[in-house]
């Protein structure tokens, strides 16, 4: 008796099933790695790290003051530029995440206090009297 040929969707379902089972087996190990890396990388600097940070900052200042950047190769300068841009871009992404809005801070229409509104109205009234 001949076996029936699997359709495209049956093959797809079999493939996704195998991939899912593999990923489900790997998940606990990957989660443990993610937690360990996150705990290490996202931790604030310890007091023991401060001297190394100061030394690196001093080296960077000396590098800029003595204009050693003119001696960099094209590849090195592109790598350093890419790293600097990445830091700047992630800063802006963090700002967007922090304010929970992409284009700026959401300011309610009644943000201006009553006191400020009263002062503006008084200035307008005085300006109208003078005119």
UniProtKB/Swiss-Prot annotation:
It is found in: Mitochondrion membrane. The keyword Mitochondrion applies. Pfam families: ATP-synt_G. GO terms for molecular function: proton transmembrane transporter activity. Keywords: ATP synthesis, CF(0), Hydrogen ion transport, Ion transport, Membrane, Mitochondrion, Transport. The keyword Ribonucleoprotein does not apply. One of its GO terms (biological process) is proton motive force-driven ATP synthesis. InterPro entries: ATP_synth_F0_gsu_mt, ATP_synth_su_G_mt_met. One of its GO terms (cellular component) is proton-transporting ATP synthase complex. Its main location: mitochondrion. Transmembrane segments: none annotated. Disulfide bonds: none annotated. Subunit of the F-type ATPase which has 2 components, CF(1) - the catalytic core - and CF(0) - the membrane proton channel. Belongs to the ATPase g subunit family. Mitochondrial membrane ATP synthase (F(1)F(0) ATP synthase or Complex V) produces ATP from ADP in the presence of a proton gradient across the membrane which is generated by electron transport complexes of the respiratory chain. F-type ATPases consist of two structural domains, F(1) - containing the extramembraneous catalytic core, and F(0) - containing the membrane proton channel, linked together by a central stalk and a peripheral stalk. During catalysis, ATP synthesis in the catalytic domain of F(1) is coupled via a rotary mechanism of the central stalk subunits to proton translocation. This is Probable ATP synthase subunit g 1, mitochondrial. It comes from Caenorhabditis elegans. The gene is asg-1.
